[in-house]
């Protein structure tokens, strides 16, 4: 749950206008993904991406990521939307991008995947659990294995690593610095300064 949300005040020709900080960032086409990725967070991110596409389908969108990961299907809804919309989505890791956060970081537009220098990036295989009858557990197990194959395939495509290398590296938690993530192919550049 989010605590205090800062507000900013802008002077316009019509007087002062106040925005919550997230609305102000959205005005600059910046979407902030922070915290655990679940259905609620994913719906909010998807809605913002769709809104920004409707506002200007030619202008890039910046997705800033500081996330420990979360639910695979929630993350895949963000991934599919990033690919569905016309604007390029640049991704920027601020702090950490772990699990589904790292996956989404790697899914930014080629040449537009960034990290700040002290951020940490971590990839691993899907986590899950099951209970119930043996046949139900088998169904869930097969679905987790299917999702693992899908995620590894996309990570291999995004990074340029072989599928075998991705499978090996995601077998356990695999942590990288921003520089290591660039060498691995998950990002394109480590940012030192905002050059806007």
Curated annotation (Swiss-Prot):
It is an enzyme of class 3 (hydrolase). The keyword Lipid metabolism does not apply. GO terms for cellular component: cytoplasm; endopeptidase Clp complex. The active site is at residues 99, 124. It catalyses: Hydrolysis of proteins to small peptides in the presence of ATP and magnesium. alpha-casein is the usual test substrate. In the absence of ATP, only oligopeptides shorter than five residues are hydrolyzed (such as succinyl-Leu-Tyr-|-NHMec, and Leu-Tyr-Leu-|-Tyr-Trp, in which cleavage of the -Tyr-|-Leu- and -Tyr-|-Trp bonds also occurs). Its EC number is 3.4.21.92. It holds the Pfam family CLP_protease. Keywords: Cytoplasm, Hydrolase, Protease, Serine protease. GO terms for biological process: protein quality control for misfolded or incompletely synthesized proteins. It is found in: Cytoplasm. It comes from the Bacteria. One of its GO terms (molecular function) is ATPase binding. Its main location: cytoplasm. InterPro entries: ClpP, ClpP/crotonase-like_dom_sf, ClpP/TepA, ClpP_His_AS, ClpP_Ser_AS. Cleaves peptides in various proteins in a process that requires ATP hydrolysis. Has a chymotrypsin-like activity. Plays a major role in the degradation of misfolded proteins. PANTHER family: ATP-DEPENDENT CLP PROTEASE PROTEOLYTIC SUBUNIT (PTHR10381:SF70). Fourteen ClpP subunits assemble into 2 heptameric rings which stack back to back to give a disk-like structure with a central cavity, resembling the structure of eukaryotic proteasomes. Belongs to the peptidase S14 family. This is ATP-dependent Clp protease proteolytic subunit. It comes from Helicobacter pylori (strain ATCC 700392 / 26695). The gene is clpP.
């Amino acid at each position: 749950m989010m605590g205090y949300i800062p507000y900013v005040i802008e002077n316009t020709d019509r007087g002062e206008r106040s925005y919550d900080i997230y609305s102000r960032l959205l005005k600059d086409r910046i979407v902030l993904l922070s915290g655990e990725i679940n259905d609620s967070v994913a719906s909010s991110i998807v809605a913002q991406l769709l809104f920004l596409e409707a506002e200007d389908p030619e202008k890039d969108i910046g997705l800033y990521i500081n996330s420990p990961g979360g639910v695979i299907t929630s993350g895949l809804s963000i991934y599919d939307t990033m690919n569905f919309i016309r604007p390029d989505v640049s991704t920027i890791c601020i702090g950490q991008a772990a699990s589904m956060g790292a996956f989404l970081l790697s899914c930014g537009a080629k040449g537009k995947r960034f990290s700040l220098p002290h951020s940490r990036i971590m990839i691993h295989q899907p986590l899950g659990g099951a209970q119930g009858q043996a046949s139900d557990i088998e169904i869930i197990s097969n679905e987790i294995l299917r999702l693992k194959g899908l995620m590894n395939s996309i990570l291999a495509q995004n990074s340029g690593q072989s599928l075998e290398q991705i499978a090996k590296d995601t077998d356990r938690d695999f942590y990288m610095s921003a520089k290591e993530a660039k060498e691995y192919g998950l990002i394109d550049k480590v940012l030192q300064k905002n050059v806007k």
